[in-house]
């Protein structure tokens, strides 16, 4: 994947004469110590990130960690003190005002926690408001606004007013307003945090659907760990203005950078994070290669030699065919039937992307370990009851 948005050694010092803070940072003083000595606030300290085109990149941290400051540095709503912000390789921190406005209009949009809808404007005009300020002709901006409302399922409310909409619907309007100019990059600063839990989940689903239809680069600020795990391709953890760790949810869960990250992720429900492919194992299991010379007798011999009750039948190229047992193979032999007649109706294979939470009932009810397949139906391995319990036990280990 190409790098869409890159941040290199980015700093933001709030206050006059920020060079004083840099001298103290070089001496190893902390953010709090610098504030005590100078009154200067270190908002972001030496942040470096490379965000890929089309990914949802979540930035997390406690209040005061610098996450909202960092996202505003990406479109220069806050001016960086030092460092670079590159969009498609161009350093926007050096752009003159006119060129910066063009970038904001065409390439990057932002959704805030507050809906900030104009009560005297209908939903269509609220969605088109930014384009109106930019001088876009009325017919063009209304068409773009209507297209954006269609994307979030609100086209029938185009002529309604904000007070006629629920909180979740008003936030959809805020999202539509950001989508109206079809940006490549979408910045979302705790955009769903003011919503009720059920509505928040609906908005997360909406964002995932939008991303499936049109791959944008999304930088999403959140303090909600479940939200980050649910929507994020990768997560950055911030603390005291610094980026502490960047990785996929399972990378961070398995290898936290320090005690702060470990504590931050305490209590996470890993059954919604890990998937079948994360815990599937190819051994120990009896694999039967389906070739012209292999029938029930050959398959039965393989199971007996490996002391297995069940076997997993694969075609050339590891394409999964099904599961057989010693009993089903003996029955096929008695009836002089081919190997296909020995295949069991269960367990059915599960997709690699299935979450552990969804796997629980399937694994619990299966007579043997459940096979896992990829999108091409190729065999990846098996998941037994013991393997699933061991994986779920990681949650209690994390929370100890």
Curated annotation (Swiss-Prot):
It holds the Pfam family CBS. Induction: Induced by increased medium osmolality. Repressed by glycine betaine. ATP binds at residues 61-68. InterPro entries: AAA+_ATPase, ABC_osmolyte_uptake_ATP-bind, ABC_transporter-like_ATP-bd, ABC_transporter-like_CS, CBS_dom, CBS_dom_sf, Gly-betaine_transp_ATP-bd, P-loop_NTPase. GO terms for molecular function: ATP binding; ATP hydrolysis activity. Disruption phenotype: Uptake of glycine betaine and choline is completely abolished in the ousA-ousB double mutant. Residues 29-265 form the ABC transporter domain. One of its GO terms (cellular component) is plasma membrane. It is found in: Cell inner membrane. It comes from the Bacteria. It is a peripheral membrane protein. Keywords: Amino-acid transport, ATP-binding, CBS domain, Cell inner membrane, Cell membrane, Membrane, Nucleotide-binding, Repeat, Transport. Residues 280-339, 343-400 form the CBS domain. GO terms for biological process: amino acid transport; glycine betaine transport. SUPFAM superfamilies: CBS-domain pair (SSF54631), P-loop containing nucleoside triphosphate hydrolases (SSF52540). The complex is composed of two ATP-binding proteins (OusV), two transmembrane proteins (OusW) and a solute-binding protein (OusX). Part of the OusB ABC transporter complex involved in glycine betaine and choline uptake. May also transport several other osmoprotectants such as ectoine, DMSA, DMSP, proline and carnitine. Probably responsible for energy coupling to the transport system. Belongs to the ABC transporter superfamily. This is Glycine betaine/choline transport system ATP-binding protein OusV. It comes from Dickeya dadantii (strain 3937) (Erwinia chrysanthemi (strain 3937)).
């Amino acid at each position: 994947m190409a790098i869409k948005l890159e941040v290199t050694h980015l700093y933001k010092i709030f206050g006059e004469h920020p060079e004083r803070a840099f001298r103290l940072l070089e001496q190893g003083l902390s953010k709090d110590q610098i504030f005590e000595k100078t009154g200067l606030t270190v908002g972001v300290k030496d942040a470096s990130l490379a965000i890929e085109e089309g990914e949802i990149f979540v930035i997390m941290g406690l209040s005061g960690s610098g996450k909202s400051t960092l996202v505003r540095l990406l479109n220069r709503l806050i001016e960086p003190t030092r460092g670079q912000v590159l969009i498609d390789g161009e350093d926007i921190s050096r752009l003159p005002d006119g060129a910066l406005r063009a970038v904001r209009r065409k390439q990057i949009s932002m959704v805030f926690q507050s809906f900030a809808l104009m009560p005297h404007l209908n939903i269509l005009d609220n969605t088109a408001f930014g384009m109106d300020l930019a001088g876009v002709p009325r017919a063009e901006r209304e068409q773009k606004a209507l297209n954006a409302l269609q994307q979030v399922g609100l086209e029938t409310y185009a002529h309604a007013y904000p007070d006629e909409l629920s909180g979740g619907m008003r936030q959809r309007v805020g999202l539509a307003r950001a989508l109206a100019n079809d940006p490549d990059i979408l910045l979302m600063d705790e955009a769903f945090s003011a919503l009720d839990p059920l509505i928040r989940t609906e908005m997360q689903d909406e964002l995932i659907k939008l991303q499936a239809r049109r791959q944008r680069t999304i930088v999403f600020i959140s303090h909600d760990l479940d939200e980050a795990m649910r929507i994020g391709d990768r997560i950055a953890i911030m603390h005291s203005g610094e980026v502490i760790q960047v990785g996929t949810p399972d990378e961070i869960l398995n290898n936290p950078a320090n005690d702060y990250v470990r504590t931050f992720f305490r209590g996470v429900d890993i059954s919604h994070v890990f998937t079948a492919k994360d815990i599937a194992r190819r051994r120990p299991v009896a694999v039967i290669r389906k070739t012209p010379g292999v029938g029930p007798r050959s398959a039965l011999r393989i199971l007996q030699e490996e002391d297995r009750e069940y076997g997993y039948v694969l075609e050339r190229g590891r394409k999964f065919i099904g599961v057989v047992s010693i009993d089903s193979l003996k029955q096929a032999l008695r009836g002089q039937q081919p190997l296909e007649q020995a295949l069991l109706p269960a367990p059915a294979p599960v997709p690699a992307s299935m979450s552990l939470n969804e796997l629980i009932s399937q694994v619990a009810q299966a007579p043997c370990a459940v096979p896992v397949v990829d999108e091409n139906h190729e065999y990846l391995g098996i998941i037994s009851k013991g393997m699933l319990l061991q994986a779920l036990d990681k949650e209690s280990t994390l929370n100890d």
